[in-house]
A protein has these predicted regions:
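Membrane-embedded transmembrane helical bundles of large multi-pass transporters/channels
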Residues: 1-38, 137-382, 497-648
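Structured non-transmembrane domains adjacent to transmembrane bundles in polytopic membrane proteins
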Residues: 48-67, 73-166, 379-547, 553-572
Length: 648
């Protein structure tokens, strides 16, 4: 008797103890889940070595601010706008609000204002103020400030900027997350009921997987924080990826009950041993695929990869400990609620596929070229607010800013304050000549190069100048993450470096430009690493070169087909999809490939010919694979159908 069989029998004998321990472990898991901070700013995962990221940190240190929002106020008397500004400044974590009254008295008619100044703060019947926060864009403090600002404004006011977008993402995810989980569970339940043989089994499967998901989410406390994408996706992905382990265990238990009639503990002991042997290699390949995400310089990959890999490991442990205990406890109920399966077997399907294998090979060869072409030409977008509903407050405000003031984004230039007045003036003029720049706002542009420092309002000077650095705000007509915006940022950066080699262009659009540059490289690295890792593991498991070549080729073909479909539909994908979908699909489906191949080799060892062995393997595995695959599809499809966040 093997050690694993003995362990399995021990688990079966002490099933009540196992379940009690499982329930008790839920307490720290729930606490850990609640205590784990959720990060709603994707841009915060960019490498800290990037100049744009360093610039944000320097800005916080030098100026006490790292995030800002543009507020558009429509059809409101200037006195009321001034009162609103004062209310904003009283809100905790609002560092400073810059408006026209910081530079001139509001009693001066707008018609008498200098044209440059008027263009910055006024357009038609609207005015704009710049609200600076005392922390970074994704900080809880900045989001709290935006929420409090929204609470005191009416329909005449529109709060735009990245802090508003991040706040809306948080609110939307908090609202939708419980529904994601409910939909995924419901759709998986329906599939399991259709393909299963007992009304109770799907409930037990979902219960055990739900517990393992809670364990996974609870242990995230050791990471400090996880991204909102990780939080939203991991539960559904863990449900789909680990479902097949549960199915394998139950199938093995049913087989061993026939081998050992009247001895359920012995049957379960052997089922645990068989299941562990079957899933250990496939789970290692899945973990390796997800772990490849950790190689990304964009730290979201590491965050997602660690949590997903950890989820698979926890899922395997629960599958060979907690699930057997639950199944044994409820086995009498399982027997009472058994029914005839709607799909008894796949014999006819298997026969059709094997008889016409040449047709499927032809389909593979014919479809390969358009699949690869479509995958390589699928359009990707990097603009985060584009993935959100247009009705959200932040998107409405951004659209209002664009329509009213003809501006989409604001760049910040941080440069040495000791640059000569002549060079500073030349730099400002050159920046305003860059394509798509509407205006540049700095001390020189507002007060002139010859105005003594003593005559500049202290609040404005403190906001734009520190002991060593000076800020210039640059208004751009171009949306973030577009070719025009990226070219504009590059041109401005070249101008700044001409006068200050340590000068920086920072803000939302520069960060998104870096995001595009970083993830383009990461995409290649992750794909190569995940394929290489899985290839090597399969090669070691099967002691063959041809097997990993065949399995990886088939899965990569499926990934290319999947990623090519949006191209032929004319749909743009969010950048996250291009990075993680392939890795997730590779990690999730390699289990099926290993299961089918292992069964084929087993049939060959029994003496069957190649065709008969493939036929037998297909008949034995197809239903389990289809059940798990359709369950995964149903869960992810349900979430995609409901979610208002395109990235999810």
């Amino acid at each position: 008797m093997t050690t694993m069989v003995k362990t399995g029998k021990w688990i079966a004998k002490h099933r009540i103890l196992i379940v009690l321990i499982g329930i008790l472990l839920l307490i720290p898991s729930v606490i850990g889940t609640i205590k784990t901070r959720i990060n709603y700013d994707i841009l915060s995962y960019l490498p800290e070595s990037l100049e744009t990221v360093k610039g944000q940190d320097v800005m916080v240190d030098e100026f006490g601010t790292g995030a800002f929002s543009m507020v558009v106020v429509e059809d409101m008397p200037l006195k009321d706008v001034q009162k609103l500004k004062n209310k904003f400044e009283e809100i905790e974590h609002v560092k400073k609000v810059l408006w026209y009254d910081d530079i001139a008295d509001i009693s001066v008619p707008t018609s008498m204002m200098p044209k440059d100044l008027k263009n910055i703060f006024f357009a038609d019947d609207s005015t704009m103020m710049l609200v600076l926060f005392d922390n970074t864009t994704s900080s809880d403090e900045a989001m709290e400030a935006v929420t409090n600002m929204r609470a005191i404004v009416d329909k005449q006011c529109f709060i735009s900027g990245m802090s508003g977008v991040v706040t809306d993402i948080k609110n939307l995810c908090l609202q939708e997350l419980p529904i994601y989980v409910a939909i995924a569970a419901l759709f998986s339940f329906i599939v399991l009921e259709i393909t299963g043989t007992s009304f109770v089994v799907p409930i037990l499967f979902l219960l055990c997987i739900g517990i393992s998901i809670l364990y996974n989410m609870g242990t995230n406390i050791f990471l400090g924080e996880i991204s909102y994408l990780t939080q939203a996706l991991v539960a559904i992905l863990q449900l789909g990826v680990t479902m097949d382990y549960s199915i394998f265990l139950l199938d093995s238990f049913e087989e061993n009950k026939k081998r050992f009639p009247g001895d359920k503990n012995r049957a379960m002991g052997h089922a645990i041993s068989n299941t562990f042997k079957s899933i250990v290699s496939s789970s290692i390949t899945t973990v390796a695929g997800f772990a490849a995400l950790c190689l990304m310089t964009f730290a979201l990959g590491k965050n997602l990869g660690i949590v997903m890999a950890k989820g698979v490991i926890i899922g395997v442990i629960c599958c060979v400990t907690l699930l057997p205990a639950i199944i044994l406890i409820f086995d009498p109920l399982i027997e009472k609620t058994k029914h005839k399966p709607l799909i008894k077997n796949t014999n006819r399907l298997s026969g059709f596929i094997i008889r016409h294998y040449k047709i499927w090979l032809a389909v593979f060869c014919i479809g390969l070229l358009p699949a690869v072409y479509g995958n390589n030409h699928t359009k990707i977008y990097y603009n985060i607010d584009k993935s959100l509903p247009s009705t959200l407050d932040s998107n409405v405000a951004n659209k209002k800013l664009e329509d009213t003031f003809d501006m989409s984004t604001m760049h910040i230039i941080m440069m040495d304050k000791n640059i000569s007045n002549a060079n500073r003036t030349t730099l400002m003029k050159d920046i305003e000549k860059v394509d798509g720049v509407k205006w540049a706002f700095g001390l020189n542009s507002v007060f002139g190069a010859n105005v003594p420092a003593s005559m500049i309002p202290k609040d404005v000077k403190d906001m734009l100048q520190s002991d060593e650095q000076e800020l210039v705000f640059v208004c751009s007509k171009y949306s973030s993450a577009t070719d025009e915006s990226n070219s504009q940022i590059a041109a401005i950066n070249d101008l700044v470096k001409k006068y200050d080699s340590n000068g920086m262009v920072i803000g939302e659009a520069p960060l998104m430009k870096d995001l595009q540059d970083v993830t383009d490289i990461d995409l290649v690295n992750v794909n190569v690493a995940s394929v290489a890792a899985i290839f090597i593991i399969i090669m070691l498991v099967f002691k063959s070169i041809s097997v990993p070549i065949i399995l990886v080729a088939v899965i990569e073909f499926a990934i290319n087909v999947n990623m090519a479909i949006p191209f032929f539909q004319g749909i743009e994908l969010p950048f996250v999809a291009s990075i993680v979908v392939g890795t997730i699909q590779l990690g999730a489906t390699v289990d099926y490939a290993i299961l089918m191949t292992s069964r084929y080799q087993k049939e060959r060892r029994k003496g069957f010919g190649k065709k008969e062995a493939v036929m037998n393997a297909h008949k034995a595995c197809a239903l389990s694979i289809m059940t798990s695959g359709f369950s995964f599809f149903a869960a992810t499809f349900g979430v995609a159908w409901y979610s208002k966040v395109d990235m999810i």
